[in-house]
Swiss-Prot record:
Cross-referenced Gene3D superfamilies: 5' to 3' exonuclease, C-terminal subdomain (1.10.150.20), DNA-directed RNA polymerase, insert domain (2.170.120.12), RNA polymerase, RBP11-like subunit (3.30.1360.10)
Xref: SMART domains: RPOLD (SM00662)
Protein name: DNA-directed RNA polymerase subunit alpha
Enzyme kind, highest EC tier: transferase
Superkingdom, taxonomy of origin: Bacteria
Segments for region (Alpha N-terminal domain (alpha-NTD)): 1-244
Region (Alpha C-terminal domain (alpha-CTD)): 259-332
GO molecular function per UniProt: DNA binding; DNA-directed RNA polymerase activity; protein dimerization activity
GO CC terms, sorted: cytoplasm; DNA-directed RNA polymerase complex
Similarity comment text for this entry: Belongs to the RNA polymerase alpha chain family.
Domain comment as written in the entry: The N-terminal domain is essential for RNAP assembly and basal transcription, whereas the C-terminal domain is involved in interaction with transcriptional regulators and with upstream promoter elements.
E.C. no: 2.7.7.6
Function in brief: DNA-dependent RNA polymerase catalyzes the transcription of DNA into RNA using the four ribonucleoside triphosphates as substrates.
Organism of derivation: Mesomycoplasma hyopneumoniae (strain J / ATCC 25934 / NCTC 10110)
Amino acid sequence: MKKHAKVYYSENLVEQVNEFETSFEIKPLERGLGNTLGNALRRTVLSSIPSCAVFGVKIEGIKHEFTVLDDVIEDVVTILNNLKRVRFFYNPSVFSQNSIHVASFLGQKAGQIYARDIESHSGLKIVNPDLYIADVSKVGALKFELFITNGKGFVDFETNKKYVNEVISLLESQIEGSVLAVDSDFSPVLNANYQAVEINSASPIIEEKLNFSIKTDGSIFAKDALSQGAKILIAHLNLLADVENLNKFSADFFGDQEIKEEPIRRFSNSIDALDLSVRSLNALRRAQYYKISDIEKLSQDDFENIKNLGRKSVQEIMEKLQNYKNENKGEN
């Protein structure tokens, strides 16, 4: 029986531009597998990698997108189009399922406003700080909040409008106005290309090398995008390989336990892991507490001194924190 050759997988450092744009080599592969793997990986990383994006915007005093803003050169539609392009570095440990985060600009300056002037309440890092937002002639003339969540693919304005209506009661805000839905492009991969090259055409046994290049928008590292794409394919193929369980429903079809949930517990201690109410989470974040290790040393008096934390919220946090400690005894 023919033995399979050892397959080597490496990053092509010669073609690496930075952590967000690089190339990988996989070799040797049996003839035909280069195109098979390359095509499957390319389609997956372009369509199925999760990230975060703005889904709603609140501008002070604005009820709809056709309202006129005084002392601002751009109209509301233009500002919305600029704001939906603000990108944040995606850290799965910060985003629990369906969690919502807020970033804001509260009119602290006049002149040209850029993405770097936006403050994230959750410590999210903006990856395109030079993105132009608007030109303001008066301090305080423009105030806005961005509402951010995680997802994948492209979500249109109409779908996000329904989502805004569903979660409007959960959105805490410091300004007056309506939450305006925008399109969300969650896909972090800008380009992905592959090439299958024969590497021993003179030999009776022809093998291939797969060159796979990938470029992201800066919200996720290129190697992480490729890794997640491979894991998504593996999760699907594992289901197809399980011929002993045909016609049975698989609750873990996308491999969520491996791809999403395990890293949150094993490699991170974000306060999102406590499953707190939105009010409690926002109060902790505004007080600059983002990790469980930051709050586990606090006393009840310390919690009660945190702004916007009432007795019920303090009790909730302490109970959830104790439950988390009990569940994770022996882990680390």
